[in-house]
């Protein structure tokens, strides 16, 4: 048995190892006869030997007709395929894997594999290649890499441009009435709930989401102002105002100028509010002092007239006290005399004229003293 059949059956026979030289010297199979008709059905896979040439596919028969698929492929793909499938690229082993013996017969082999595995179309060369061919393959591969890198850069730039081209949102222009209502609501609560936002939307005729965005921006502005004036803007302004009042320092012109647009729009609204209140309080105090000064002369004149018209009524407290003490003593003496007279049983004698006059004077003094006490009460 000679040829491929002998080489295929040689490993199965015991005690007869296959020499490498025999496999290398085996002639290629004869070409088919000109008169033979090709079989219409699929050809079963042929058993090949395990020699070096069979494994590498060097004994493959050339195709009987030229393939047109090679012309349809672009030049860049062919150059890249030649550089990959060349012995310098894969070490001369790739053709055996892509050859007819490397793929089983029950798999449909693609046309581009057959074209690329054809040694005549790819023009495989031995390891020693000409320097001109190496340069051309390297330049072709570098050109293809440059094209792919440029395509990637273009795709990245287009993606970045599409990201940057965002839809511009419509900017809401608030009226003075809307701003005033929003500021009032912000002073009441920095974080209004959904119900408060809906009520504010009905009042200002603004959408609820616009009101929510406005409150977010207003809170950010408020935090920025807090950082500018300290941890708490109200306490910082209060301390500043106290120091200015204590040392009689006037307000800076910048704060006064910012108050022209409105207290809430100024850089220190609480400080300006306190300054305004202090000015109003000072003006009210000045008015009260002027009214009191105008009323004081009238009171002085009235007192003088009253004192001048009735000088007898101007009695000191000491005189009243002395009169009251004397009246009490007189009453005590009368009581004592009456008691003594009743005890002794003596008939009361008639008083003389001098004694009657003295008693009358005492009674008049008592009556006058009682009248004075009533007036004082």
Swiss-Prot record:
SUPFAM superfamilies: Homeodomain-like. One of its GO terms (molecular function) is DNA-binding transcription repressor activity, RNA polymerase II-specific. It is found in: Nucleus. A motif (OAR) lies at residues 323-336. GO terms for biological process: cell fate commitment; central nervous system neuron differentiation; negative regulation of neuroblast proliferation; neuroblast proliferation; positive regulation of cell population proliferation; positive regulation of transcription by RNA polymerase II; regulation of DNA-templated transcription; retinal bipolar neuron differentiation. Residues 1-50, 129-170, 285-377 are annotated as: Disordered. Residues 285-310, 347-377 have a biased composition (Basic and acidic residues). Keywords: Activator, Developmental protein, DNA-binding, Homeobox, Nucleus, Repressor, Sensory transduction, Transcription, Transcription regulation, Vision. CDD domains: homeodomain. InterPro entries: CVC, HD, Homeobox_CS, Homeodomain-like_sf, OAR_dom, VSX_homeobox_regulators. PROSITE patterns: CVC, HOMEOBOX_1, HOMEOBOX_2, OAR. Pfam families: Homeodomain, OAR. Its main location: nucleus. Retina and spinal cord. Residues 167-226 bind DNA. Belongs to the paired homeobox family. Acts as a transcriptional regulator. Plays a significant role in the specification and morphogenesis of the sensory retina. Mediates differentiation of V2a interneurons by repression of motor neuron gene transcription, via competitively binding to response elements that are activated by the ISL1-LHX3 complex. May also participate in the development of the cells of the inner nuclear layer, particularly bipolar cells. This is Visual system homeobox 2.
């Amino acid at each position: 048995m000679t040829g491929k059949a002998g080489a295929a059956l040689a490993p199965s026979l015991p005690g007869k190892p296959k020499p490498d030289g025999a496999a290398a010297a085996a002639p290629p199979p004869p070409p088919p006869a000109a008169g033979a008709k090709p079989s219409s059905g699929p050809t079963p896979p042929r058993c090949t030997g395990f020699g070096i040439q069979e494994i590498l596919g060097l004994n493959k028969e050339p195709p009987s007709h030229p393939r047109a698929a090679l012309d349809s492929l672009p030049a860049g793909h062919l150059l890249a395929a030649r550089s990959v499938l060349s012995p310098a690229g894969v070490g001369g082993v790739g053709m055996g894997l892509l050859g007819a013996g490397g793929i089983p017969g029950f798999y449909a082999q693609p046309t581009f594999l057959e074209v690329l595995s054809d040694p005549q179309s790819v023009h495989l060369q031995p390891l020693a290649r000409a320097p001109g061919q190496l340069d051309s393959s390297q330049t072709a591969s570098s050109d293809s890499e440059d094209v792919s890198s440029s395509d990637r850069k273009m795709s990245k730039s287009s993606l970045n441009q599409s990201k940057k081209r965002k839809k511009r949102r419509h900017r809401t222009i608030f009226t003075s009435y809307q701003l005033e209502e929003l500021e009032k609501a912000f002073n009441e609560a920095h974080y209004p709930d959904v119900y408060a936002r809906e009520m504010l939307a009905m009042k200002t005729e603004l959408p609820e989401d616009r009101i929510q965005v406005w409150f977010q921006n207003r809170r950010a502005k408020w935090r920025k102002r807090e950082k500018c004036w300290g941890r708490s803007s109200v306490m910082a302004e209060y301390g500043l105002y106290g120091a200015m009042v204590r040392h009689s320092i006037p307000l800076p012109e910048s704060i006064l100028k910012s108050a022209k647009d409105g207290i809430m729009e100024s850089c220190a609204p609480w400080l300006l509010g306190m300054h305004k209140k202090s000015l109003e309080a000072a003006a009210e105090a000045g008015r009260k002092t002027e009214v009191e000064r105008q009323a004081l002369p009238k009171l002085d004149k009235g007192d003088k007239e009253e004192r001048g018209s009735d000088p007898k009524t101007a009695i000191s407290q000491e005189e009243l006290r002395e009169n009251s003490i004397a009246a009490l003593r007189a009453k005590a003496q009368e009581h004592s005399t009456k008691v003594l007279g009743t005890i002794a049983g003596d008939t009361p004698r008639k008083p003389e004229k001098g004694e009657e006059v003295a008693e009358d004077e005492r009674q008049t003094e008592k009556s006058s003293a009682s009248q004075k006490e009533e007036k004082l009460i």
